A protein has these predicted regions:
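Extreme N-terminal starter segment of soluble prokaryotic enzymes
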Residues: 2-6
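Class I SAM-dependent methyltransferase "Motif I" SAM/SAH-binding loop
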Residues: 9-14, 91
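Conserved SAM-binding loop of SAM-dependent methyltransferases across substrates and taxa
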Residues: 13-29
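Short beta-strand element of Class I
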Residues: 33-34
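Conserved SAM/SAH-binding beta-strand->alpha-helix loop
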Residues: 40
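S-adenosyl-L-methionine
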Residues: 45-81
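Class I S-adenosyl-L-methionine
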Residues: 67, 72-81, 93-188
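N-terminal Rossmann-like NAD(P) cofactor-binding module of classical short-chain dehydrogenase/reductase
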Residues: 86-88, 129
C-alpha cells in the first residue's frame, strides 16, 4: 500500500516521476505518481513509456478538464485509503531565470503558478510541492517591453504565497544547489 500518491504537473519526460516511484521506506515502494500532465506530446510519450501505470494528459495545465483526473484520483484513493496526495508542479522557469538574460519575459508563462489553484480546489491535495529557480521568488509585474518592474520585485510571488495559505496550507521554501546533490551544475 502506497503512503503518497503524486500528481505530476509539467512532468516532462519523467525525471521527477522516476525519483518519486523509486522512493522506498523499509525496502518497499512508498510513493507513486498516478497522473501526469504536460503540453508536449513527445515528453508525454517518453513519460508513458517509462511510467505506463500513470494516467497521462497531453494538455496545457490551464485548459485541462479536471474531472477525469479527479475520478482517477478517487479510484487510487480507494485502493490506498491511507495515502496522502501530493500535487507536484515543476513550473516553467525560463521566464523567471537569470539564464533568460535581458530578453523580454512572457507574461502569460509567468502566471502558470496561478493556475494551480484550480487543481488545489479540484483534488484537495494534502501537500503541494513546487520546484523552480530561485528567481521565482522575485516574480512581479512586467513593463510594456516585457521587462520586470524592479519596484514590483517579488510582489506577485508574495501574493501567490498568501493565496496558497488561504487554502489552509503552511508554506516553507528552501533554495537547494544541484551540485550539493551530485549534479554537475550549480543551478539553484
Amino acid at each position: 500500500m502506497k503512503k503518497l500518491l503524486y500528481i505530476d504537473l509539467f512532468c516532462g519526460a519523467g525525471g521527477t516521476s522516476t525519483g518519486v516511484n523509486t522512493a522506498r521506506l523499509h525496502g518497499e515502494q512508498c510513493a507513486e505518481v498516478i497522473a501526469c500532465v504536460n503540453h508536449d506530446a513527445n515528453a508525454i510519450a517518453s513519460h508513458a513509456a517509462n511510467h505506463p501505470d500513470a494516467l497521462h494528459f497531453t494538455e496545457d495545465i490551464r485548459t485541462l478538464e479536471l474531472s477525469p483526473l479527479v475520478h482517477h484520483l478517487q479510484k487510487c484513493r480507494t485502493k490506498n485509503p491511507d495515502a496522502l496526495v501530493v500535487l507536484w508542479a515543476s513550473l516553467e522557469c525560463t521566464n523567471f531565470s537569470r539564464a533568460k538574460g535581458g530578453q523580454p519575459r512572457d507574461a502569460d508563462s509567468r502566471t502558470l503558478a496561478e493556475h494551480l489553484f484550480r487543481y488545489i480546489e479540484a483534488i484537495d491535495p494534502d501537500y503541494i510541492q513546487i520546484e523552480n529557480v530561485e528567481e521565482f521568488m522575485s516574480w512581479g509585474e512586467l513593463d510594456e517591453n516585457g521587462k520586470p518592474v524592479s519596484k514590483d520585485r517579488g510582489k506577485s510571488y508574495i501574493k501567490w504565497v498568501n493565496n496558497v495559505k488561504k487554502y489552509g496550507y503552511n508554506f516553507t521554501h528552501r533554495i537547494l544547489n544541484a551540485a550539493d546533490f551530485g549534479a554537475y551544475t550549480s543551478r539553484k
